[in-house]
UniProtKB/Swiss-Prot annotation:
Transmembrane portions of the chain: none
Keyword set, alphabetical order: ATP-binding, Isoprene biosynthesis, Kinase, Nucleotide-binding, Transferase
Name of the protein in question: 4-diphosphocytidyl-2-C-methyl-D-erythritol kinase
UniProt-annotated catalytic positions: K14, D138
Keyword Kinase set for record: yes
């Protein structure tokens, strides 16, 4: 019997444990090295199959942008597979926008994985990865299913094992425009290439985030958030192009130092204690 619906489909966020800009291609895309680490801060998606071929998103929150990545993913898979089916899609959004946590990219990846199953397409992970790259540089990582060493513009993924850790993640109210950060004169674009063995020797303290200095110049709130975590956990770093920042909070069954209370944070800031994931919760949804 074919599936009629898929409910409570997770779309986990990620942290960039480091992010080095190692060059720039002739087409303007920046070349990166990073480790993407999955965390249990996640959106939740729901899908119901439609027979009329329509793709409809039913969110009661803010109006959806025309280029909504989730719908773009659904349309792309529908077109490339020539599938006559459609879907009603809704998202319980928990991962904040403009955070550098990959929330939108993860939603798109979970959409590809879910509709591949709901529509009975049986596409391989490799085919879905190729679609994901058309949607954005971070999407293939979430389709891939594992923590990864990431190179190129985000398309070269090497699965790696990461020790289970707790991460304190703090999202200030500001949204940092990615275009402004990559266009900043403060951005270093020639960081020396590293190796996985370099990272593995000291996974928590290795490297830096080349986007952090431009983001700090753009927003005092990023500076404040980094300082707040550093005072509590001893070190802090920004994820992606921001504005979320994070710090290691222990490796045991519970965090070594708890997350600060929401009442102690500036207005509209969001703090979350997150557990690192060893694999994506949908890792078995594609071959």
């Amino acid at each position: 019997m074919s599936l009629q619906a898929l409910y409570d489909v997770p779309a986990p966020a990620k942290l960039n444990l480091f992010l080095h800009v190692t060059g720039r291609r002739d087409d303007g895309y920046h070349l990166l090295q990073s480790v993407f680490a999955l965390i249990d801060w996640a959106d939740t998606l729901h899908f119901e199959r439609r027979l009329d071929g329509r793709l409809v998103r039913h969110d009661l929150a803010a109006a959806l942008p025309e280029d909504d990545l989730c719908l773009r993913a659904a349309r792309l898979l529908q077109r490339e597979s020539a599938c006559p089916l459609g879907a009603d899609i809704s998202i319980d959004k928990d991962v904040p926008w403009g955070a550098g946590l990959g929330g939108g990219s993860s939603d798109a990846a979970s959409t590809l994985l879910a509709l591949n199953r709901l529509w009975g397409l049986h596409w391989s992970r490799e085919r879905l990865l190729a679609l994901g790259l058309q949607l954005g540089a971070d999407v293939p990582f979430f389709v891939g299913g594992h923590n990864a060493w990431v190179e190129g513009i985000g398309e070269r993924l090497t699965p790696i094992e990461l020790a289970p850790r707790w991460w304190a993640v703090l999202k200030p109210a500001v949204a940092v425009p990615t275009v402004a950060i990559f266009g900043s004169p403060l951005l270093v674009r020639n960081t020396a290439a590293a190796t996985i063995s370099d990272f593995s020797a000291n996974a928590v303290e290795f490297g830096h985030n080349d986007l952090q200095t431009p983001a700090m110049a753009y927003s005092d709130e990023v500076v404040q958030a980094l300082a707040l975590l550093q005072s509590r956990y001893g070190a802090s770093r920004m994820s992606g192009s921001g504005s979320a920042v994070f710090a290691e909070a222990g490796t045991g069954e519970s965090p070594t130092v708890a997350m600060m209370e929401a009442a102690s944070l500036p207005p509209s800031w969001v703090g979350r204690m997150c557990r690192g994931l060893t694999v994506h919760p949908l890792a078995l949804w594609a071959g």
